A protein has these predicted regions:
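Divalent-cation
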Residues: 1-140
Length: 140
């Protein structure tokens, strides 16, 4: 969330009000958990709600291979100034939706650079920002 409030969309989900950490995000998006489906809304450094419903884009120019998650990410970016990060459930690939445009298949450095550019934050201020990844199912 930036200047345009996402409060109406927050209300469609479950209040969380927790500091953004990799552990929290991993737990939210773990399969077969109550918070798994839907969007997470972040304000500043806090996860404010999870399992939120977002409006789907009706942009006919979007690839037919994109599913609901990507269409919702683009949809919310078409009607608000939010930066939307989408992680494919099938492939784990990262996309960013902003102002109705979708950038796909970003690596961690590209995502970090894109976030800083959109949010007008110099990269130097957030050198320790790390992109979270789910734990490997092969490791014990």
């Amino acid at each position: 969330e930036q200047k345009v409030s996402l409060r109406d969309y927050e209300r469609t989900g479950i209040d969380v009000d927790g500091i953004v950490t990799s552990q929290l995000l991993i737990n939210i998006f773990e399969h077969n958990t109550p918070l798994h489906d839907g969007a997470v809304i972040i304000q500043g450094n806090r996860v404010v709600s999870a399992t939120c419903y977002l409006p789907l884009s009706d942009n006919l120019g979007l690839s037919k291979e994109l599913g609901t998650r990507h269409r919702a990410g683009v949809g919310i970016s078409e009607i608000t100034d939010s930066l939307t990060i989408i992680v494919s459930e099938e492939t784990g690939k990262i996309s960013v939706a902003y102002e109705g445009e979708l950038e796909r298949n970003l690596d961690a450095d590209s995502l970090r650079d894109r976030m800083h550019k959109i949010l007008n934050n110099p990269v130097e201020e957030h050198k320790n920002l790390r992109i979270w990844k789910g734990r490997s199912r092969d490791k014990k």
